[in-house]
Amino acid sequence: MEQTWRWYGPNDPVSLDDVRQAGATGVVTALHHIPNGQVWPVSEIKQRQAEIAAKGLVWSVVESVPIHEEIKTHSGNYDQHIENYQQTLRNLAECGIDIVCYNFMPILDWTRTDLEYQLPDGSKALRFDQIAFAAFELHILKRPGAEKDYTAEEQAQAKAYFDAMTEADIAKLTGNIIAGLPGAEEGYTLDQFRARLAEYDGIDKAQLRENMAYFLRAIIPVAEQVGLRMAVHPDDPPRPILGLPRIVSTIEDMQWLKETVDSIHNGFTMCTGSYGVRADNDLVKMIETFGDRIHFTHLRSTCREGNPKTFHEGGHLQGDVDMYSVVKAILTEEQRRQAAGDMRPIPMRPDHGHQMLDDLHKKTNPGYSAIGRLKGLAEVRGVELALKRTFFPELK
């Protein structure tokens, strides 16, 4: 596997020097300063490449080229936004970048309720609390019809949770959910968020699938022409939230995506933390079934709690993800590709590390502090080395 590292550009507290010292060789980044829907100029791409190359690294994967909301809702200037997206792909390919990670989650990117969940050892993790989220939906956002998405017990727990909140607690929870986490290109106020939700009135799972299919039928032929591989990231959490449909959450969704535009360029990001939140997602089976379409991997683990929809980020080798078996399945796919003449390793990045040690005293991007990811990368690297020595000695 190619060892890569997510970097949020010049404003990231983690520097490219840090990335190199962590042992990564590839950088996963994006042009975050360019507004959603606009073309990424070749000059801007090359400038970012030069910054990365100056530190002895390479820009391996784009994460992400954001998809404008009007594409997802199939409204407004969606065709123009798609044309701009196509041109961005051409420009990236012209610069030699050939993997693009993206997602099709409505409105919000990945979602958490607690960005500073303290673990028993004193480190901090990200957490999604189903009851806290219910309290937000029912009593802060006050989304009409939200009660249908929760059991009577969850509604009662959410009411008790909300009643115990201070104004500061309410502001913090609201900000955590709608203000935009790292990688999300847009944040909202409550009123803006309500207006954005209203744009999805009448868009169910079938309609969102059709909107994504329209996008893919326009994008994948361009990717084929320029030799670029698209890698869709799963929903996080992998289920409907806020009354919004989610369509990249299960192995059935992966099959639908494959069949919708059946091209090797229409592929997946295997994010074990996102898919792994669901106990019914068999990660190894997913890799074995769609191995030739997996162009990028995010390796992390989560820990499901008493409420099966509540989880927190675990250590990379702890939690509900069997990282040993996952890495073995990825290496099996790499071996198959190399036997067929494709010597390119599959890019992997350690996802979401715990905030720990010296990083507890620094301002960091939630989930993206240096030391926790350094630990995760070292652990996954060790698993990979042991597996290669034991089962895959011929792998490069």
UniProtKB/Swiss-Prot annotation:
The keyword Manganese applies. Belongs to the mannonate dehydratase family. It is an enzyme of class 4 (lyase). Pathway: Carbohydrate metabolism; pentose and glucuronate interconversion. It comes from Yersinia enterocolitica serotype O:8 / biotype 1B (strain NCTC 13174 / 8081). It catalyses: D-mannonate = 2-dehydro-3-deoxy-D-gluconate + H2O. Its EC number is 4.2.1.8. HAMAP family: UxuA (MF_00106). Catalyzes the dehydration of D-mannonate. PANTHER family: MANNONATE DEHYDRATASE. Pfam families: UxuA (PF03786). GO terms for molecular function: ferrous iron binding; manganese ion binding; mannonate dehydratase activity. This is Mannonate dehydratase. One of its GO terms (biological process) is D-glucuronate catabolic process. Keywords: Iron, Lyase, Manganese. Its cofactor is Fe(2+); Mn(2+).
